[in-house]
Amino acid sequence: MKKIASILVTAVAPFNDHAANRGEKLLGNASSVKRRPDGRVYVSGQMQRHVLFSAIERLNAMDPKRGDTYVANGDGISTDIAKDLRSDLGGFLSTSKGDYSGRRIAPISATPAVARAKSKVGHDLLIRLKMNEEESKQKQALAVNEFSQADDMIMNFHLDIGAVGVTKKFEYNKEESHVATHYEQHINDDEHLRRVKLFLEASRSMTDYANQARNAVSGEPRQVLIVLDPGMSRKAIRYFEEGTSSIEQEAILKELQARGAQYFIGDDTTDEYSSVYEAYMQAIDAVQNGKLYRPS
């Protein structure tokens, strides 16, 4: 059995009446829904990572095997990858080390979540009630708020398994030529497996988007393709895209099989495939019983 070197999750989640990632103030004094030039709304990759790490934090807090691990706040990331999951899985750039900047490339990467089709954007008129006329001489405050009516959002996450819990160190000779690379492991195999499973679990637990008090949405998938890959590929992120034909979908799956990758398809809208829940359980079981790549 080939070792699993990376995991790709590509999923479709329905968002209704949402403002999951407002952006520029195109309407004056209220934020507008982020959307592309083609009219499709999107949630930025930064927001997707925020929601994913929020899910990882909750899952880790409930895990009796978490030990002294934690997920640091986004504004206070440490460089302790043995304990800080955001530092390990999310990477960091530390500029407080004198002439040297500590830099860690994130094992987790995410794409923006993009609507499959052109979005229909609605507008709410907001009025700030002036209860006491003596309080302010300004005119009554009016604002327009945008929301998107209904979108099937395609989102993608990728994990470089070999980079989890490890730092890469370079050896140079007197001429300052790079002559060797060494890997330092900061966690044992059990903790490595636990963090990989946390990533998978978090990708189906996406809820902490913006504006959840008034425009709550769920990023939990309706359709999903999970790839346990012996290599490093993100080609399968095209699987659910609107322009991908059934022929191309079949070609993607055949290529995965030819490379020795395992894949799991979940679809809650048909009985042709397993449900999303079943697909995740199958993938987690395969990770649990498989061999994960760790550089040495």
Regions found by a protein language model. Give the residues of each.
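RNA-binding basic/glycine-rich loop and surface signature characteristic of RAMP-family CRISPR effectors
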Residues: 1-296
